[in-house]
Amino acid sequence: MAVSAGFKVSIEIVKKVLDLGRQYGVDVDGLLKEYDFRIQPIKGDPAYMPAEDVEFMLSVGLRQMSDPLPGLTLGVVSQQQLFGLVAFLAQTSSTVGACLEKIMQLEPLISNIGKTCLEYSPGEAQLIWHCHIQDPFVRTHVGSFILFTYTQLINTGTQAGHLVHEVHMAHPAPKDRATLDVYRNAFNCPVIFNARHYRVLFPATAVDLSVNTADPMLNTVLAEHAQKLLEERAKPASFTDEGRLHIQKLLQDGNVSRENVAAML
């Protein structure tokens, strides 16, 4: 069962994921050709593609990796770099709390297949990722990737060192001890499986810690730019954008002609 209609993923992020797969040795281009998979923008929303297409792509691609925990491994390899602007904003926020708030604000630039929120209980902060992916295999590895990225951000973002003291996974534990140890070694803390949500737990006081090399002025400029991007992407596609998309599709299909362009417009 795929994600429901209305969920989407940034095409820019999809391309970065494909490049990451190539770097890891996956025959990405061969798989794209074999399954006739194309990066097709959503009509009226040219910066994104349907999440169900991306879920299928991940289902195929992740299974090509010999690693039993491909999502976790890709998280280790990519660190925060995959998130581009979001990661850069995080690095320039003044505190851990401000950094996490900025990521939550900008999450829609990446996708709406998951939503991050920050909740508090006495003495503890919980960074929760609500996942809308239905395919159990894909959900397992995307969830592992997301939580590893958040854990690294919190643990390496300040002078305090290791802050995350527990991680919850909303999928079953691996059956063999060796794979379970990989999880625990990667997160360097207890990992709880079959939890209700994907969750990273750390001291509530950590949200007020200063972030390494924070630059509040640069953060303000970048935040304003990111907000403009969000506003622009929320607008309906213009006639020019629609025309560009149609022509790109014709180019991909090898059917470019004056008649075909006129017919699509």
Where is each model-derived feature located?
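Short, solvent-exposed positions on alpha-helices
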Residues: 29-30, 140-141, 259
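Hydrophobic alpha-helical core bundles mediating ligand binding, dimerization, or RNAP-core interactions
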Residues: 58, 147-150, 247
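Short, contiguous, pocket-lining structural segments
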Residues: 9, 138, 142, 214, ...
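Extended mid-to-C-terminal alpha-helical interaction segments
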Residues: 182-265
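N-terminal low-complexity or simple alpha-helical regulatory segments
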Residues: 1-127
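Residues within well-ordered alpha helices
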Residues: 20, 30-31, 153, 183, ...
